[in-house]
Amino acid sequence: MSIRRKLAATVATGAFVVVGLATAIPAASAAEGDGNCTSNDAGAGGDLCLYFNSYEAGARFNDPYTDNYAGWVFKAWTSGTAGGSNGAGVAVKNNAASVQNWDTALTGYVYYNSNQQGLKQGFSAFTAGNLVSGLKNNNASQGW
């Protein structure tokens, strides 16, 4: 076999292996909170819950510490007769309309930019409300 044919066969085999690997690797899925907003996460205070819709409606995202919403999605939830699924699976970053603070003492803040930067809105302990127009569907992180 000539060098050209060997090289062509090697390249073709390598391409087949690369294509096979590319199709065998599953796509990474977005992370989601458990959807259970609580006032005590293992002694760490409570969750700051973001909702897809105004007035604490629709799917929600909960986490006490998120300095960047990228990669997180809203999750459908139910609790007794309440619940929401509108927006489930949608990215949290730049898609929240309202917030509920389940912390027992701290004010939770939602920020326009990642890493607690830019315009922010605070929610005192055990309060809720709609995000202001500059943050509604323009949210990137949270902090205390």
Give names to the regions the model predicted.
Residues 2-22, 26-144:
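Compact beta-sheet-dominated domain cores in extracellular/mature segments
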